[in-house]
Amino acid sequence: MGYISIDSSTSSTTIIVFDEKLKIKKKFQKEHKQIFTPEGYVEHDLNEIYQNLINLMRLASQLESNPKFISLTNQRETFALFDKETGRPVHNAIVWQCTRGQKYCDEIINNPSISNRITQKTGLKANSFFS
């Protein structure tokens, strides 16, 4: 019984199948599009990422149909909203590289009482990196 690792990164989805001694049996990878809008926004099509994941898992499951565990990692600060009823994405994922929230961060930075409170509670300064 082996293991499967899934990494949904900024540029692709990668699945690695390991044997029981953690030796790599096979690596599968599929890139997804980076959507750069004229406004400078950065997004990902969640349906494309989902379809890539399904297709890669089909390939991986031919090598390991009953893994002991599956590990998952993702892009961290990228975020998405899903419809509670349908489970479908409401919009593309907002990628960590996107700066659409920077004007709000600037407002916070220019207000020391709010800015200091955020830094005190989080240890971080307001930054669009954190979506």
Can you describe what each PLM-predicted range is?
Residues 1-91, 116, 120:
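N-terminal glycine/serine-rich phosphate-binding loop of ATP-dependent small-molecule kinases
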Residues 81-131:
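Glycine-rich phosphate-binding loop and adjoining helix at the ATP-binding site
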